[in-house]
Amino acid sequence: MEFLPLFHNLRGSRVLVVGGGEIALRKSRLLADAGAVLRVVAPQIEDQLRELVQGSGGELMLRGYQEADLDGCTLIIAATDDEPLNAQVSSDAKRRCVPVNVVDAPALCSVIFPAIVDRSPLVIAVSSGGDAPVLARLIRAKLETWIPSTYGQLAGLAARFRAQVKGLYPDVQQRRAFWEEVFQGPIADRQLAGQGDEAERLLIEKVNGAPPYAPGEVYLVGAGPGDPDLLTFRALRLMQQADVVLYDRLVAPAILELCRRDAERIYVGKRRADHAVPQDQINQQLVDLAKQGKRVLRLKGGDPFIFGRGGEEIEELAAHGIPFQVVPGITAASGCAAYAGIPLTHRDYAQSVRFITGHLKNGTSDLPWQDLVGPSQTLVFYMGLIGLPIICEQLIKHGRAADTPAALIQQGTTSNQRVFTGTLADLPRMVAEHEVHAPTLVIVGEVVVLREKLKWFEGAQSQV
């Protein structure tokens, strides 16, 4: 190990930065965030750097470097493109036994800057010892996606009770066991969900010796339209910690595979006129599982609040006092249209977009047809495949031109994506001709003509 990782408390300490350009600015931002008082020396200094120095209560010296500039400084940064000058600064600092960092010159450094994941007070540093800084940054980027921003709040919560817990448990092993329970249980879950007051209440109960009562929790998570890369960071984290998963037909297998391996999986999918599990039973199942203390993942295709009946499910949870979180997903209209190269709005073609359920009830579709035939709007029909002949007939009957551009997107955003474009009048024929099946999204509007120019993702097959 060439460099020993240490964390330096710079608050109120004077730090010398030699250089006034972009590199000096980047380093100075980090130093200012850590509370350092900046002394910047350079013949020319960028305006943003000037403001940063003034904000830190530091000083600007518009001239060349002098060794006396090191006086009173606890850390030295050389950030110029003048190699002899950088070497001189390094030599002067080392002679005085003051830590020095020379940007992009590890051999001249006694300290180096790592790539940082900041979840203050939790801070993670990644370093390659200056050998491969790009690799360190890539690893940091991965950590940024894995560690929620709320981890800092969790660390802050623990800090407020640290002294009290130390008094209760003088033995280090007991303290470790206490905090492991906190960080792996319902207290951490509440804090990470943004429910800080509830997390603090549970921690107070635990500190006072009462076993904190916390029922399980339900995570209502939107799985997006199919491509796993479209999941949010929060969705992935909750998928990895759930004890049981209730999922529907629209959740792609590749997404389901990202759930915790040992989690129980329960299929509650619904097809038209064939509800594998009635909605009221799904609602009750969520309540029952949560009351058993389990972390329950309700995984829904698309977004749970857009034709997903997510509102009904959390109404039931709220009625029973079950904690829940809602994680939005990319809805099918947005995801599938983007992957098909069809912008839903465009100033030359459509100034509004409507998301419409095409699901028939008793063989009819009770929609405000007159509103749907207005100009400069895009219509997106969910679950519209079965009722497509009626939808097309009614739109044309109420004034939408039969030659209005239209598209069918089957299994959008996945490797099996198929896109077929034509006209409003053509859609029913296209379904039969190409054996289109659910899940398929229907888009009607002038924006469809842009697909030929804007398409970028091709799945199994597409046809115009």
From Swiss-Prot:
Give all cystine bridges in this chain. Answer: none
UniProt cross-references to Gene3D superfamilies, sorted A to Z:
Cobalt-precorrin-4 Transmethylase, Domain 1, Methyltransferase, Cobalt-precorrin-4 Transmethylase, Domain 2, NAD(P)-binding Rossmann-like Domain, Sirohaem synthase, dimerisation domain, Siroheme synthase, domain 2
Which UniProt key words apply to this protein?
Cobalamin biosynthesis, Lyase, Methyltransferase, Multifunctional enzyme, NAD, Oxidoreductase, Phosphoprotein, Porphyrin biosynthesis, S-adenosyl-L-methionine, Transferase
Alphabetized Pfam families for the sequence? CysG_dimeriser, NAD_binding_7, Sirohm_synth_M, TP_methylase
Matching CDD domains, A to Z? SUMT
Keyword Cytoplasm in the entry? The reply is no
Q: In which pathway does it act?
A: Cofactor biosynthesis; adenosylcobalamin biosynthesis; precorrin-2 from uroporphyrinogen III: step 1/1; Cofactor biosynthesis; adenosylcobalamin biosynthesis; sirohydrochlorin from precorrin-2: step 1/1; Porphyrin-containing compound metabolism; siroheme biosynthesis; precorrin-2 from uroporphyrinogen III: step 1/1; Porphyrin-containing compound metabolism; siroheme biosynthesis; siroheme from sirohydrochlorin: step 1/1
The positions annotated for binding S-adenosyl-L-methionine are P225, G301, G302, D303, I306, T331, A332, M383, G412
> Positions of the region Uroporphyrinogen-III C-methyltransferase?
216-464
Residue positions binding NAD(+): E22, I23, P43, Q44
Protein EC: 2.1.1.107, 1.3.1.76, 4.99.1.4
Q: Does the keyword Acetylation apply?
A: no
> Could you state a single Gene Ontology molecular function term?
NAD binding
Q: Give the catalytic activity.
A: uroporphyrinogen III + 2 S-adenosyl-L-methionine = precorrin-2 + 2 S-adenosyl-L-homocysteine + H(+); precorrin-2 + NAD(+) = sirohydrochlorin + NADH + 2 H(+); siroheme + 2 H(+) = sirohydrochlorin + Fe(2+)
Which is a GO BP term held by this UniProt record? Answer: methylation
The residues annotated as the active site are D248 (proton acceptor), K270 (proton donor)
- Chain positions covered by the region annotation Precorrin-2 dehydrogenase /sirohydrochlorin ferrochelatase: 1-203
Q: Which residues carry this modification: Phosphoserine?
A: S128
What family name appears in the similarity comment? In the N-terminal section; belongs to the precorrin-2 dehydrogenase / sirohydrochlorin ferrochelatase family.
Biological role stated in the UniProt entry: Then it catalyzes the NAD-dependent ring dehydrogenation of precorrin-2 to yield sirohydrochlorin. Finally, it catalyzes the ferrochelation of sirohydrochlorin to yield siroheme.
What is the protein's given name? Siroheme synthase
Annotated source species:
Pseudomonas fluorescens (strain SBW25)
Print the organism lineage: Bacteria, Pseudomonadati, Pseudomonadota, Gammaproteobacteria, Pseudomonadales
